[in-house]
């Protein structure tokens, strides 16, 4: 006994139909959608039978306007890669049906504005950032085939989409000023992860890749295109900044070494022409070589003599206001203009070579009063080398106070 593939009952009729290599009752061969009897031809999918219209409506090419299937007998319009019913291919402003070859402006890939309405209503064009296209136009006019420099130039006309747009609406309103932008699009975290992964693989994706991203993320293809443009621009700026930082780091990390002032200066060797000469090299008309500790009783020539007024570092009085000694007793053999040498003797000693009082020196010792230099030992003795050569000339009264200024 033969059973029907549709109702699973035995076939007792005189006639039967053989569909998909199975036996059917005549009344069981019908469309699963509209329930019409199929006599001449039928279409099947997943074991179900469909009539021609229902099959193309369910599984055929979808209209980009109404999202319904397109029958093979229907007339269609094509714009870029989209297919539309004639009734769906109309202007969204005036509902006029657009004809083949007519210039139009596309919004969100599935809405159209005719040229007349676009030109007459410029505010709509500014708000929605419309881009012109021609029905059935050559693929060279599509954004995919344009030069990369033009892609970056279109950023100023399109909606600015970035991964920080969620919290930057207030700042954007201030920065835009008088210029109006298109509607803002907020990209969620999951969508952003998908876009970043796609950018890491291909920084400039093709239209096919963008269509796949649009299906995965649910975003508009124009939004995805603008996001990739902004991302490429950001990457270029980051590369420029990193290159500038690398040059600056190399400049400060390895500066040129300065050449030494004196080439190949041996240890212990002195700089012969330095700004400060050594004690043994110092010569003048008063001090000869090695004569830094000599005292000249006759004093300098009267034309170059100095007075205490010319010596700014010698105090004119002590803490109590008492003048430092008397100047009315000239030394024997001194010229009257050499009172500065009689008042003080400037000696230059290197550190650690300060003279100490030694009773074996034949020259007299000069005491320094404690009233002049504050709390110090009651009397500090200063001895001068070469005292034997001038000891006979120092015969001034003992109450005179002389101090060696170091």
From Swiss-Prot:
DNA-binding region(s), residue ranges: 180-239
Domain comment in the entry: The LIM domains exert a negative regulatory function and disruption of the LIM domains produces an activated form. In addition, two activation domains and a negative regulatory domain exist C-terminally to the homeobox.
Record's GO cellular component terms: chromatin; nucleus; protein-containing complex; transcription regulator complex
A single GO BP: renal vesicle morphogenesis
Compositionally biased residues, Low complexity: 137-148, 315-327
Function: Potential transcription factor. May play a role in early mesoderm formation and later in lateral mesoderm differentiation and neurogenesis.
Protein's name according to its UniProt entry: LIM/homeobox protein Lhx1
Gene3D superfamilies the UniProt entry points to: Cysteine Rich Protein, Homeodomain-like
Keywords annotated in UniProt: Developmental protein, Differentiation, DNA-binding, Homeobox, LIM domain, Metal-binding, Neurogenesis, Nucleus, Phosphoprotein, Repeat, Transcription, Transcription regulation, Zinc
Region span, Disordered: 128-187, 293-374
Modified residues (Phosphoserine): 162
Organism: Homo sapiens
Top-rank taxon, per record: Eukaryota
CDD domains linked to this entry: homeodomain, LIM1_Lhx1_Lhx5, LIM2_Lhx1_Lhx5
Residue ranges annotated for the LIM zinc-binding domain, each copy included: 4-54, 63-117
A GO MF label: RNA polymerase II transcription regulatory region sequence-specific DNA binding
The organism's taxonomic lineage, starting at the top: Eukaryota, Metazoa, Chordata, Craniata, Vertebrata
Subunit structure comment from the entry: Interacts with LDB1 via the tandem LIM domains.
Tissue note: Expressed in the brain, thymus, and tonsils. Expressed in samples from patients with chronic myeloid leukemia (CML) and in 58% of acute myeloid leukemia (AML) cell lines.
Composition bias, Pro residues: 352-362
Localization (cell): Nucleus
Bias type Basic and acidic residues, positions: 151-167
PROSITE patterns linked to this entry: HOMEOBOX_1, HOMEOBOX_2, LIM_DOMAIN_1, LIM_DOMAIN_2
């Amino acid at each position: 006994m033969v059973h029907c593939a549709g109702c699973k009952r035995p076939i007792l009729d005189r006639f039967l139909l053989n569909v998909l290599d199975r036996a059917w009752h005549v009344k069981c061969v019908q469309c699963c959608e509209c329930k019409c009897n199929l006599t001449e031809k039928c279409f099947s999918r997943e074991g179900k039978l469909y009539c021609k219209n229902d099959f193309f409506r369910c599984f055929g090419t979808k209209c980009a306007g109404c999202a319904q299937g397109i029958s093979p007998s229907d007339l269609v319009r094509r714009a870029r890669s989209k297919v539309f019913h004639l009734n769906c291919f109309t202007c969204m402003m005036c509902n006029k049906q657009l004809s083949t070859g007519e210039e139009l402006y596309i919004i969100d890939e599935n809405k159209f504005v005719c040229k007349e309405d676009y030109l007459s209503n410029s505010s709509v064009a500014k708000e929605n950032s419309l881009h012109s296209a021609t029905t059935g136009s050559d693929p060279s006019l599509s954004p995919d085939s344009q030069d990369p420099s033009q892609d970056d130039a279109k950023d100023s006309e399109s909606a600015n989409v970035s991964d920080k747009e969620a919290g930057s609406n207030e700042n954007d309103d201030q920065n835009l000023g008088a210029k109006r932008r298109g509607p803002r699009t907020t990209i969620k975290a999951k969508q952003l992860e998908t876009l970043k992964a796609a950018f890491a693989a291909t920084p400039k994706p093709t239209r096919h890749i963008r269509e796949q991203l649009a299906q995965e993320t649910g975003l508009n293809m124009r939004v995805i295109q603008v996001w990739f443009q902004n991302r490429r621009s950001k990457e270029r700026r980051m590369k420029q900044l990193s290159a500038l930082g690398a040059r600056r780091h190399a400049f400060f990390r390895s500066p040129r070494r300065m050449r030494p002032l004196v080439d190949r200066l041996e240890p212990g060797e002195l700089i012969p022409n330095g700004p400060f000469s050594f004690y043994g090299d110092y010569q003048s008309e008063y001090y000869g070589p090695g004569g830094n500790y000599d005292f000249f009783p006759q004093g300098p020539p009267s034309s170059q003599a100095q007075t205490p007024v010319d010596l700014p570092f010698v105090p004119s009085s002590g803490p109590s206001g008492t003048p430092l000694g008397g100047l009315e007793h000239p030394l024997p053999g001194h010229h009257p203009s050499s009172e500065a040498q009689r008042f003080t003797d400037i000696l230059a000693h290197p550190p650690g070579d300060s003279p100490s009082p030694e009773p074996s020196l034949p020259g007299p010792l000069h005491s320094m009063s404690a009233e002049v230099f504050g709390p110090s030992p009651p009397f500090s003795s200063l001895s001068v080398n070469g005292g034997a050569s001038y000891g006979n000339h120092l015969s001034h009264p003992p109450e005179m106070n002389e101090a060696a200024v170091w």
